[in-house]
A protein has these predicted regions:
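Amide-donor transfer/coupling interface in amidating biosynthetic enzymes
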Residues: 2-12, 118-232
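Cysteine-nucleophile active-site neighborhood
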Residues: 53-120
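Catalytic metal-binding/acid-base residues of hydrolase active sites
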Residues: 34, 57, 89, 140, ...
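Conserved beta-strand termini and adjacent loop/short-helix elements that scaffold enzyme active sites
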Residues: 33-36, 106, 137, 155
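Short glycine-/acidic-enriched loop or helix-start segments at secondary-structure transitions
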Residues: 16-17, 61-63, 93-96, 146, ...
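Short, glycine/charged-enriched secondary-structure capping and boundary segments
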Residues: 19-22, 47, 64-67, 97-101, ...
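N-terminal beta1-alpha1 cap of cysteine-dependent amidohydrolase-like domains
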Residues: 1-81, 196-232
Length: 232
C-alpha cells in the first residue's frame, strides 16, 4: 500500500509551517513526524514515499536531529523509497548522501522567483531546455554532488545545483518552494523582514524582475505520487 512519511523540519514557534502548504497537495494517506524535535518512525516499512520539508534551520548545524534525519535518509535510499526533499530537504539529502562538503553557506541570501533552467529530462521538473519559475529563499546551497551517482537537473543564475536526482533511485532534491505561490512568498518576506531580506514592495514595484510563478506545484506533485519505489 502506498503511504507517505512527511518529515516536518519546522522549528518550535517557527514562521514557516510546512505541512500547512503541502497537505492540500498530498494525494496519499500520510503520517507526519516532527523530525526537528527528534520525532522519527522506528522503521520505514509502512511507507512507499518520503517527503522532506523545508526549515528555517541551517542544515550545516551539527544538531543531533539533523544527524538522525540523515541516517533515516540513507536508510530510505537503501530501501528504494521514493524520496523528495524541498529547500532544507534538498540540502539534507545532499549532505546525507554526498558528505558535509556537499552544502555550503551562500555569500548572500538567494530570494525571489528566478528563471529555473531544466538541464535534463525529468519526471518531476519537465523537459530539458525548458524554463519554469518558482519561489526560492535560502542562505545555504548544495554545491557538490557525486556525478557518478546523481545528476544536476536544474539551475538558476544564482545557484548551479537548484535540483538533482539520483541516477538509479527515485530520489530528488529540489531547492525551490513550489508549494509557496506569489502571495505566500510575499507574505513570508514580510514575516522574516530584516537585514538582507528585500522588502516585498520592491517586487510589486519591479519592472525588471516582478514575481512570476509557473504553478509547477501541480505537475510536480502528480509526478511525485506516480513515482514508484526502486525494486532491486
Amino acid at each position: 500500500m502506498d503511504r507517505i512519511l512527511f518529515l516536518d523540519n519546522s522549528i518550535k514557534n517557527d514562521l514557516y509551517k510546512p505541512l500547512a502548504y503541502w497537505e492540500p497537495v498530498l494525494q496519499l494517506d500520510f503520517d507526519s513526524y516532527r523530525a526537528s524535535a527528534g520525532d522519527l518512525p522506528h522503521d520505514l516499512d509502512d511507507y512507499s514515499h518520503i517527503f522532506i520539508s523545508g526549515s528555517t534551520a541551517s542544515v550545516l548545524a551539527n544538531a543531533d536531529w539533523i544527524e538522525a534525519e540523515q541516517e533515516l535518509i540513507r536508510t530510505a535510499v537503501g530501501q528504494g523509497k521514493v524520496v523528495v526533499g524541498s529547500c532544507f530537504g534538498h540540502q539534507i539529502i545532499a549532505r546525507a548522501l554526498f558528505g558535509d562538503g556537499a552544502v555550503r553557506k551562500r555569500r548572500a541570501l538567494d530570494v525571489g522567483w528566478p528563471e529555473i533552467e531544466i538541464l535534463a529530462d525529468d519526471a518531476l521538473l519537465g523537459e530539458a531546455g525548458s524554463k519554469i519559475y518558482g519561489y526560492v529563499f535560502h542562505y545555504d546551497e548544495v554545491c557538490k554532488i557525486d556525478e557518478n551517482e546523481a545528476t544536476a537537473i536544474a539551475r538558476s543564475d544564482a545557484c548551479e545545483i537548484l535540483a538533482f536526482k539520483l541516477k538509479d533511485r527515485p530520489v530528488w532534491g529540489v531547492q525551490p518552494h513550489f508549494e509557496m505561490g506569489i502571495v505566500d512568498g510575499l507574505k513570508f518576506l514580510e514575516l522574516v523582514k530584516g537585514e538582507g531580506v528585500p522588502d516585498r514592495q520592491s517586487y510589486l514595484k519591479s519592472t525588471v524582475k516582478p514575481p512570476k510563478d509557473s504553478g509547477w506545484i501541480i505537475p510536480f506533485m502528480k509526478a511525485y505520487h506516480k513515482a514508484r519505489p526502486f525494486q532491486a
